[in-house]
UniProtKB/Swiss-Prot annotation:
Its EC number is 4.2.1.96. GO terms for biological process: tetrahydrobiopterin biosynthetic process. Transmembrane segments: none annotated. The keyword Transcription does not apply. This is Putative pterin-4-alpha-carbinolamine dehydratase. Belongs to the pterin-4-alpha-carbinolamine dehydratase family. It catalyses: (4aS,6R)-4a-hydroxy-L-erythro-5,6,7,8-tetrahydrobiopterin = (6R)-L-erythro-6,7-dihydrobiopterin + H2O. The lineage of its organism: Archaea, Methanobacteriati, Methanobacteriota, Stenosarchaea group, Halobacteria. PANTHER family: PTERIN-4-ALPHA-CARBINOLAMINE DEHYDRATASE. It comes from the Archaea. InterPro entries: PCD_sf (IPR036428), Pterin_deHydtase (IPR001533). It holds the Pfam family Pterin_4a. NCBIfam families: PRK00823.1-2 (NF002017).
Amino acid sequence: MADLLSDAEISDRLPEEWTREDDEIVRVFEFDGYLDASGFLSAAAGLAEDAWHHPEMTIRWGEVEVRLTTHDAGGITENDIDLAERLNGIHD
């Protein structure tokens, strides 16, 4: 099981555009339309599966909200930070 990050570690490592909400890190990715958003969601699902780390993802017209936490650790771990950075990489 992955170790929880401290509050200071989370603050220092939180990727650009991500915010912390309790025991999760959250970002809303914006797109020009639904098809672009769904394409990102599909790519994000592939990254998540490769990492064996499955976020909560919500698609709406022109945006995808992603929430990351490590359930078995009870909060935010290195796995969440790593996947957030990878998701930024396929969007930005």
